[in-house]
Amino acid sequence: LLGSLGEAGHRVQVHVAMRYGSPALPDVMDELMRQGVQRVLVLPLYPQYSATTTASAFDAVAQWLQRTRRLPELRFVNDYHDDPAYIDALASSVRAHWQREGRGERLVMSFHGIPARCVERGDPYRDQCLRTAGLLANRLGLPQGELVVSLQSRLGRARWLEPYTEPTLRQLAA
């Protein structure tokens, strides 16, 4: 990212900050302020928007803002699920895998799951996942039904978005 921006003539810094790891978001924001950075673009690495993911990163920035005295100009990227560069990157990754391993009968695209109640409350996550999958299938020239969407990483007893990945894989293997 930094290289591409530099080639385009932009003078920027790229920093990684994590919600649940190191370097922690508040520490990175503090360092940016020490360096005199005046504008910050927050780009969560969640292509599809969800209150459970993207918004939690925005919440972390808001918590940091509550304890700072210097307010930088902030911009946020909500999602990039249908950005052509993102779809191209996915397609390139799939094609590279096919070259190394061969092409299977189906391509399974497994997204991280979220509780179904989030979508019922208006979260666009499922629709954006399906849009990403459709654009990828189109970019790869896959016929209808060759790309299968599933969702993984279910926690707890609440109903999560379906279809779940494990049963989907078992069904495809049968």
Mark where each language-model region is:
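Extended amphipathic ligand-handling, pore-lining, and cofactor/metal-binding catalytic surfaces
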Residues: 1-174
